[in-house]
């Protein structure tokens, strides 16, 4: 039996990544080679060009080889280049993300014996267009033929609400990851979940707390004890030392979530090659002092997101926690005292996004072009149905095509629930192969229906696919536009075309007059105007292919549009 929906979801995180699969109405995290649910988003390349991904790569950060990197997600879609010293190779951020995605894909093949052809990949809600494009390219380079993107807060809400019996509720998704922060108000109502509003910061996360521990606590103590000239984080001379300090800070931060005190230790060489060994005791109170400004900053973003939609904290049922830092009790206490809303961490904050991505993947039909070739003599079916919805008697349809059949008069098709043995009864195909049927679905499980096709003589024929699935569950109504988009006019006014927060796709049509003179029959010249998206401006160039003039207005009849962001 081949898959008819994508089913696999990936959380491509700044510090850690994970992959999950939808099985029925439940999700399963696919463990990696180390038998862990999450894989560190770290990549190393040695002098022979061998690539390592995950914990082994992360361990090499401390080796001072210049051959391992982490947190490259923050630079997705930029021109930044990571240089691997031993091999001399240069890699872009999306190329390193490709290696992480390849590793997750290989984990599925090892654990399930299945080659994943398509997968939903999550992105922060605050990711811009160029960052999303870079993520798509990384997925394609990793071997995924289809990779729909899903915003991380939407994924988290789906993981919580897929099988929930919710009439109407507002949830606040609080996603404090390793390197990015997202806050989103979600509305769950009668089987649909959609984003009401969102905000975020692509440079706010657990890594910032780690670096603050390093710079506010560890560095001052080391400078008070040792003679370390120009001992700053930005000094390439001390790159190795600061990598060790950060790793120690991260470990100590995690330890302090369970105990009152922790010891931060490690060793590195000074400017003269002498080994320096540090042993620093850190109390939970000191950690809270360092971490609190970041938690307060994230809470202020949440409050702004609520106020923009005139929602009070009392209107929100719960805060859904996402991200490793939210596992710490002190973190939760500070957050709840700042927001005044109950917290929900019933689904593991480390894997909730991957699980939600898998749920969404179950709503995405697998593109037939990505499926295995149809065997000789078989019939193909282009299914047209929603794999997930709240209707217990959904409609399903499709079109049958065959190796040589053009007229399907006399053909019949029947759908059979493989578990309950419910049957649709034989449905006559139209002459062009089109059919429509009503299904009967059971709650609490993925309903699989065998497709039985019969020719005019009553002989059963093989089909691809040979099943379709339907699950009664919550669906994402629509994903929102991240930032408003509009055109800057010659009089310095701004004409908004598409509204932030509204569902996609959005379309808008405006008639504008150009201040640039255009002659009838003119071609080859360029019209330039400014497209604004949120706080980002872009230059748009329209290359004129053919123009015509009518009275006082100038019209561009045919144009080629290209966008270049500054």
Named regions from a protein language model:
Residues 1-75, 82, 87-90, 109-566:
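Oxyanion-binding/catalytic loops of NTP- or PPi-dependent enzymes
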Residues 88-99:
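Conserved AMP-binding/adenylate-forming core of the ANL superfamily
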Residues 101-105:
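Generic structural signal for well-ordered alpha-helices
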């Amino acid at each position: 039996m081949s898959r008819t929906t994508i089913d696999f979801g990936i959380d491509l995180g700044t510090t850690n990544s994970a992959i999950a699969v939808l099985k029925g109405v439940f999700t399963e995290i696919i463990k990696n080679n180390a038998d862990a649910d999450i894989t560190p988003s770290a990549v190393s390349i040695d002098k022979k060009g061998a690539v390592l991904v995950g914990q082994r790569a992360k361990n090499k950060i401390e080796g001072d080889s210049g051959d391992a990197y982490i947190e490259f997600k923050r630079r997705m879609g930029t021109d930044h280049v990571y240089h691997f010293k031993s091999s001399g190779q240069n890699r872009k951020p999306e190329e390193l993300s490709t290696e992480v995605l390849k590793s997750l894909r290989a984990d599925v093949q090892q654990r399930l014996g299945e080659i994943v052809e398509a997968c939903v990949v999550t992105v922060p809600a605050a990711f811009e267009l160029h960052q999303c494009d870079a993520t798509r390219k990384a997925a394609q380079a990793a071997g995924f033929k289809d990779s729909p993107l899903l915003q991380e807060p939407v994924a988290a809400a789906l993981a919580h609400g897929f099988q929930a019996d919710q009439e109407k509720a507002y949830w606040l998704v609080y996603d404090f990851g390793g390197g990015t922060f997202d806050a989103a108000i979600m509305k769950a109502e009668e089987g649909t979940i959609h984003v009401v509003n969102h905000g975020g910061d692509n440079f706010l996360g657990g890594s910032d707390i780690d670096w603050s521990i390093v710079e506010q606590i560890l560095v001052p103590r080391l400078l008070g004890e040792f003679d370390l000239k120009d001992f700053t984080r930005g000094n390439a001379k001390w790159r190795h030392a600061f990598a060790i300090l950060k790793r120690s800070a991260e470990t100590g931060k995690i330890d302090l979530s369970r105990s009152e005190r922790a010891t931060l230790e490690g060793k590195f060489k000074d400017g003269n090659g002498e080994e320096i060994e540090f042993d620093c005791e850190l109390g939970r109170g000191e950690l809270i002092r360092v971490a609190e400004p970041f938690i307060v900053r994230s809470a202020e973003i949440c409050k702004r997101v609520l106020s923009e939609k005139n929602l009070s904290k009392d209107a929100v049922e719960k805060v859904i926690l996402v991200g490793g830092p939210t596992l710490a009790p002190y973190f939760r206490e500070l957050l709840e005292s700042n927001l005044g809303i109950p917290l929900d961490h019933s689904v593991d904050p480390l894997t909730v996004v991957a699980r939600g991505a898998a749920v969404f993947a179950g709503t995405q039909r697998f593109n037939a072009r990505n499926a295995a070739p149809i065997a000789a003599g078989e019939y193909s079916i282009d299914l047209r149905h929603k794999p997930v919805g709240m209707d217990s008697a959904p409609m399903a349809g499709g079109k049958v095509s065959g190796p040589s059949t053009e007229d399907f008069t006399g053909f019949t098709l029947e759908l059979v629930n493989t578990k309950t043995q419910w049957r649709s009864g034989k449905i006559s195909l139209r002459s062009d192969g089109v059919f429509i049927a009503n299904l009967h679905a059971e709650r609490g499980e993925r309903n699989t229906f065998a497709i039985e096709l019969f020719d005019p003589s009553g002989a059963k024929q093989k089909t691809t696919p040979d099943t379709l699935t339907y699950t009664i569950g919550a669906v994402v109504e629509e994903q929102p536009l991240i930032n408003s988009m509009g055109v800057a006019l010659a009089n310095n006014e701004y004409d908004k075309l598409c509204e932030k927060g509204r569902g996609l796709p959005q379309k808008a049509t405006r008639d504008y007059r150009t201040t640039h003179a255009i002659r009838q029959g003119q071609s080859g010249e360029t019209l330039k105007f400014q497209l604004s998206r949120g706080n980002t401006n872009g230059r748009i160039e329209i290359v004129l292919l053919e123009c015509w003039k009518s009275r006082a207005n100038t019209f561009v009849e045919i144009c080629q549009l290209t966008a270049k962001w500054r």
